[in-house]
Amino acid sequence: VDILEEKTKDQDLEIELYKYMGPLKEQSKSTSAASTSDELSGSEGPSTESTSTGNQGEDKTTDNTYKEMEELEEAEGTSNLKKGLEFYKSSLKLDQLDKEKPKKKKSKRKKKRDSSSDRILLEESKTFTSENEL
């Protein structure tokens, strides 16, 4: 009796998984809602027959489910990666634009500062040489 209860629990969990996976499968394979309902009824059919064919059907569906989940994880990972790359590229462009604007202003200021610092250096060198001459 415990074995039958465990099998029904497994079947219920598998059905819930297919309900959850249904919309994701539709997006990736562009299938209609009718095909997912056919798949759900197909997965329920073999499991309600004898135990030997039910186990084989369950093994196949769990293998397929595992493969589908891996594919979805890979697909989601690549979409996140693409989003990350787009964000990185856009932030680089924004950083470059921000850096270009202040550079122009800073370069003008540096020239002014350089000329004033040159004057100061010249004056210091004159005072230093005049002090040394004394």
Swiss-Prot record:
The keyword Transferase does not apply. Residues 102-113 have a biased composition (Basic residues). Residues 57-69, 114-126 have a biased composition (Basic and acidic residues). Residues 21-82, 96-134 are annotated as: Disordered. It comes from the Eukaryota. Transmembrane segments: none annotated. Residues 29-38 have a biased composition (Polar residues). Residues 39-54 have a biased composition (Low complexity). Disulfide bonds: none annotated. Keywords: Malaria. This is Rhoptry antigen protein. It comes from Plasmodium falciparum. The lineage of its organism: Eukaryota, Sar, Alveolata, Apicomplexa, Aconoidasida.
